[in-house]
Amino acid sequence: MGRSESQMDITDINTPKPKKKQRWTPLEISLSVLVLLLTVIAVTMIALYATYDDGICKSSDCIKSAARLIQNMDATAEPCTDFFKYACGGWLKRNVIPETSSRYSNFDILRDELEVILKDVLQEPKTEDIVAVQKAKTLYRSCVNETAIDSRGGQPLLKLLPDVYGWPVATQNWEQTYGTSWSAEKSIAQLNSNYGKKVLINFFVGTDDKNSMNHIIHIDQPRLGLPSRDYYECTGIYKEACTAYVDFMIAVAKLIRQEEGLPIDENQISVEMNKVMELEKEIANATTKSEDRNDPMLLYNKMTLAQIQNNFSLEINGKPFSWSNFTNEIMSTVNINIPNEEDVVVYAPEYLIKLKPILTKYFPRDFQNLFSWRFIMDLVSSLSRTYKDSRNAFRKALYGTTSESATWRRCANYVNGNMENAVGRLYVEAAFAGESKHVVEDLIAQIREVFIQTLDDLTWMDAETKKKAEEKALAIKERIGYPDDIVSNDNKLNNEYLELNYKEDEYFENIIQNLKFSQSKQLKKLREKVDKDEWITGAAIVNAFYSSGRNQIVFPAGILQPPFFSAQQSNSLNYGGIGMVIGHEITHGFDDNGRNFNKDGDLVDWWTQQSANNFKEQSQCMVYQYGNFSWDLAGGQHLNGINTLGENIADNGGIGQAYRAYQNYVKKNGEEKLLPGIDLNHKQLFFLNFAQVWCGTYRPEYAVNSIKTDVHSPGNFRIIGSLQNSVEFSEAFQCPKNSYMNPEKKCRVW
């Protein structure tokens, strides 16, 4: 039998025997040792590199922050010559103002992004939505329902006009229909009480400045159809706006007459609307300039209703104007009777005196044409496309925009403005990181402490006033993120909007409902105490606020995001961002307006005469500094150093306090790791992030508008003005003395 294959020998009998193993040569041994050593060194180096701390932060958040800062800046610019160009040059090259925008800035980009979130949360109904949220979503859907809006033309407005004495220019036989029953008191009161529209006389219920727990009636000068009284010069840079304004009136009057089936006499319409412009121009000239209305002590004139009748006896259409009838016509809508002994605060006595001779020159038809027009112009954008388009040239003249914002953007903002707590709930649930609240609370505590410590450095303020200032700073109440109730208390939120009932196909009626609801709510407050725990803003807002009557600072959820704040970004950026904003809002309690209110929010003079005089002297430095800035986009006009003083004081105080708070942080916690790819230390990064918040630009038309209407300086001057006054900035960037960013004369109030 042969052998099994499994047992075959594995070595062939013919395979030669192996040779005896040879030893390694000294060279081979040396090379092997060398390779081993190199391998060990390489592994060690890799291990060391992986754990080596080179002082550079390599986290994804640091990389993102560095990329954002680098992208926005122009490193080739000289920081000591023009820090705006240095900080924002890259941003300006990359960004073009959208056709729908009058200006564009980092602030506006954040607002655009917030609007996207609002759109997402408002457009999708959910079965679990509480009633208040359902109403917000219904209101939004009615607003974006352009098919329904366009199909109705101007009919919703035409149905409403008889409730406000009609619009004479667009009414056949107005004198016969309305003229006999018309009275100025009733006409002005109806627009005010039902729709919150204040024409000729601004009557409103608000907090009593001298007793901030109570509400009181106020009488003030009205807002105007054009942005400011300056526009009514109607020459030079204002000529186009005046022409577009009258053309806007004429176009709407023709549309209404056409829709009513009335004949159109273009010459007659033009004559009537030019008369409206003439009347409004006289009213504008009677108003007091904004720079003369900055002292709340001088604005506050308390008197009884009977005294108002004696002091400001007006006459319209040959009849004495009854202040009592006018007041009660408004307040009767909320079932409140106003006796002649009722106290009223008059903010504009000079206006009322100047108004008297104007009123005798015009007829009821002229007044009603103006009153109804001022109401109609607000409602045109709620009507069909034909009506909306009538506003195009006017919008271009005031804002420089050639296109409307997307419908969904306008609607998201409208719903947010009218149902801020319902929308705030949706925003918070979708986008707000709750842990931010505690970090910001700590920042507020730090910056408040710095403000109080800084009082010791002030040589212009005496000890008595410093003590009162410290008490006020300690009494400031903060509100961060959102009111807890909007998320946790469904019943309270539902009850807030209980009276509102919207229909998806009746957007115009929904708007009217909101106007009535809002005005009724405000008028009813006259006999109620002020709720100082109430938030003065919604959560879905990219902004921050100070209330002098409440001595309260508010930082809504919408602003607690980069570049202002992130729990993950470097602290230098947080202090330069939200830290500066916190300091800014605290300082508002001590600016040219806020300093007149005490720790309880009452208009009380708590300053010694010497300290008050010194404050005005210190402030005057900033009035001159900012008033000397010439803005090319506004035709070379100079900024108004008086109107912008409060904001400029707050900017300067805020940047100084935030920087000192950051220095304290570094002393306590040590230096932070540097950001990758950007050759700046954290002192420099603090100022860079502060500046980049204000990167932006304006359309020339809106620059002309805002230089007269905005109490803030334009972004570039907010950067330059405050940093020119900062010794710490010049030290951080080693700016030579008398360079543009480091002038010898520096202004400081706080």
From Swiss-Prot:
<keyword id="KW-1015">Disulfide bond</keyword>
<feature type="modified residue" description="Phosphoserine">
    <location>
        <position position="4"/>
    </location>
</feature>
<feature type="binding site">
    <location>
        <position position="647"/>
    </location>
    <ligand>
        <name>Zn(2+)</name>
    </ligand>
</feature>
<feature type="transmembrane region" description="Helical; Signal-anchor for type II membrane protein">
    <location>
        <begin position="29"/>
        <end position="51"/>
    </location>
</feature>
<dbReference type="GO" id="GO:0006518">
    <property type="term" value="P:peptide metabolic process"/>
</dbReference>
<keyword id="KW-1003">Cell membrane</keyword>
<feature type="active site">
    <location>
        <position position="585"/>
    </location>
</feature>
<feature type="binding site">
    <location>
        <position position="103"/>
    </location>
    <ligand>
        <name>a peptide</name>
    </ligand>
</feature>
<dbReference type="GO" id="GO:0010815">
    <property type="term" value="P:bradykinin catabolic process"/>
</dbReference>
<dbReference type="GO" id="GO:0042277">
    <property type="term" value="F:peptide binding"/>
</dbReference>
<keyword id="KW-0862">Zinc</keyword>
<feature type="glycosylation site" description="N-linked (GlcNAc...) asparagine">
    <location>
        <position position="325"/>
    </location>
</feature>
<dbReference type="InterPro" id="IPR042089">
    <property type="entry name" value="Peptidase_M13_dom_2"/>
</dbReference>
<dbReference type="GO" id="GO:0005737">
    <property type="term" value="C:cytoplasm"/>
</dbReference>
<keyword id="KW-0645">Protease</keyword>
<feature type="topological domain" description="Extracellular">
    <location>
        <begin position="52"/>
        <end position="750"/>
    </location>
</feature>
<dbReference type="GO" id="GO:0001822">
    <property type="term" value="P:kidney development"/>
</dbReference>
<feature type="glycosylation site" description="N-linked (GlcNAc...) asparagine">
    <location>
        <position position="285"/>
    </location>
</feature>
<keyword id="KW-0735">Signal-anchor</keyword>
<dbReference type="GO" id="GO:0010814">
    <property type="term" value="P:substance P catabolic process"/>
</dbReference>
<dbReference type="GO" id="GO:0008270">
    <property type="term" value="F:zinc ion binding"/>
</dbReference>
<feature type="lipid moiety-binding region" description="N-myristoyl glycine">
    <location>
        <position position="2"/>
    </location>
</feature>
<feature type="disulfide bond">
    <location>
        <begin position="88"/>
        <end position="695"/>
    </location>
</feature>
<feature type="glycosylation site" description="N-linked (GlcNAc...) asparagine">
    <location>
        <position position="311"/>
    </location>
</feature>
<feature type="binding site">
    <location>
        <position position="588"/>
    </location>
    <ligand>
        <name>Zn(2+)</name>
    </ligand>
</feature>
<keyword id="KW-0449">Lipoprotein</keyword>
<dbReference type="GO" id="GO:0045202">
    <property type="term" value="C:synapse"/>
</dbReference>
<dbReference type="GO" id="GO:0071493">
    <property type="term" value="P:cellular response to UV-B"/>
</dbReference>
<dbReference type="InterPro" id="IPR000718">
    <property type="entry name" value="Peptidase_M13"/>
</dbReference>
<dbReference type="InterPro" id="IPR018497">
    <property type="entry name" value="Peptidase_M13_C"/>
</dbReference>
<keyword id="KW-0482">Metalloprotease</keyword>
<feature type="region of interest" description="Disordered">
    <location>
        <begin position="1"/>
        <end position="20"/>
    </location>
</feature>
<dbReference type="GO" id="GO:0006508">
    <property type="term" value="P:proteolysis"/>
</dbReference>
<keyword id="KW-0378">Hydrolase</keyword>
<feature type="glycosylation site" description="N-linked (GlcNAc...) asparagine">
    <location>
        <position position="145"/>
    </location>
</feature>
<dbReference type="GO" id="GO:0046449">
    <property type="term" value="P:creatinine metabolic process"/>
</dbReference>
<keyword id="KW-0325">Glycoprotein</keyword>
<dbReference type="GO" id="GO:0071492">
    <property type="term" value="P:cellular response to UV-A"/>
</dbReference>
<keyword id="KW-0519">Myristate</keyword>
<dbReference type="Pfam" id="PF01431">
    <property type="entry name" value="Peptidase_M13"/>
</dbReference>
<keyword id="KW-0812">Transmembrane</keyword>
<dbReference type="GO" id="GO:0030424">
    <property type="term" value="C:axon"/>
</dbReference>
